[in-house]
């Protein structure tokens, strides 16, 4: 099956591989003048860089029936179902910002309380220098939450 993508981004960051079927983000890239090319962060073949997940009572619930639209003809948004949950998602790379965000909104279709969790999971498998040919960059990769603004930081040294 050929994957359909919904690319987006801004003048700083490119999000070329947002999967229409799953809402998973396979990679993102940015221009690095010191490297004179694009630096691309990629997920693994078995687990993308970022993918929405949903759990109820300790059991994973698949995200299904995604329908997509573009807010302001640019920002990819979706509606989907995960078991008894209605899910809305949006991937935004605001103009002028050197980053992006993946926003999820979840509503229960059931009466009464639910015990569950949702968020993003993934694997930062590799970093690549991309000009005419892609070359993997060696280094130690770390993801952590910024103490300054609680953002997720991708750090490679």
Task: Show which residues each predicted segment covers.
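Terminal accessory carbohydrate-recognition/targeting modules of carbohydrate-active enzymes
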Residues: 1-157
């Amino acid at each position: 099956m050929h994957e359909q993508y919904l690319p987006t981004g801004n003048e700083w960051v490119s999000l070329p591989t947002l999967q229409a079927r799953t809402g998973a983000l396979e990679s993102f890239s940015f221009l690095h003048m010191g490297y004179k090319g694009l630096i691309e962060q990629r997920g693994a073949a078995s687990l993308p860089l970022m993918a929405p997940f949903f759990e109820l009572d300790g059991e994973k619930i698949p995200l299904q029936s995604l329908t997509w639209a573009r807010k302001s003809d640019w920002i990819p948004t979706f509606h989907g179902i995960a078991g008894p949950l209605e899910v809305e998602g949006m991937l935004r790379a605001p103009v002028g910002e050197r980053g992006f965000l993946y926003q999820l909104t979840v509503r229960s279709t059931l009466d009464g309380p639910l015990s569950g969790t949702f968020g993003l999971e993934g694997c930062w498998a590799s970093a690549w220098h991309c000009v005419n040919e892609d070359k993997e960059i060696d280094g130690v990769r770390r993801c952590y939450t910024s103490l300054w603004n609680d953002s997720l930081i991708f750090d490679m040294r």
